[in-house]
Amino acid sequence: MTKRYWNIDLEEMMRAGVHFGHGTRKWNPRMAPYISAKRKGIHIINLTRTARFLSEACDLVFDAASRGKQFLIVGTKNKAADLVSRAAIRARCHYVNKKWLGGMLTNWSTTEKRLHKFRDLRTEQKTEGFNRLPKRDAAVLKRQLSRLETYLGGIKYMTGLPDIVIIIDQQEEYTALRECITLGIPTISLIDTNCNPDLADISIPANDDAIASIRFILNKLVFAICEGRSSYIQNS
């Protein structure tokens, strides 16, 4: 895998608050190599390590995108939800930003059935099929469609398991991470000072609470994916 330059600037990361970890009482000792100091009761993340692993992650997603691989971005907490959907749409990735339904990947056959149902209902709605039904039946189907849109809207075009999963907040998305580990799907995870850095294939130490920090990390990964996709289109 070729190393590339991704213009990851330490001062820019500081302005985004990427270096602010959790309180010193709320930490995982395995994160010690990624912490540079304690300040006013919180751990400070070593941004040199952040830059190194973010760069590695960018190389990985660029390489995968240049070979036509598929990505899934997962971030369901309120602060991350909008950022995740916008980033995924920009990079033409699948995403989950409301709730991770247990077994979404490990029980893929069930997820596929839900997606087929979702597509059928969307077709019915577009062709005004609901209007031909009794009001009560139409209302039931509309509620079903609304629920499926909420939870599966970001993966409606997914036809198989993703090649790489990007996780925003390891603690929040632990179930998704475990499913990826079970299936052997490579993962890139944004990890704060309360996380285990040994679980994901590439762990990026960073503040997972600040919107600016999450945006910074996502923007770099999305740029790398878009560059890789351009390379794939040019070479195909």
UniProtKB/Swiss-Prot annotation:
One of its GO terms (cellular component) is mitochondrial small ribosomal subunit. Its main location: plastid. The keyword S-adenosyl-L-methionine does not apply. It is found in: Plastid, Chloroplast. One of its GO terms (molecular function) is structural constituent of ribosome. This is Small ribosomal subunit protein uS2c. One of its GO terms (biological process) is translation. Belongs to the universal ribosomal protein uS2 family. Keywords: Chloroplast, Plastid, Ribonucleoprotein, Ribosomal protein.
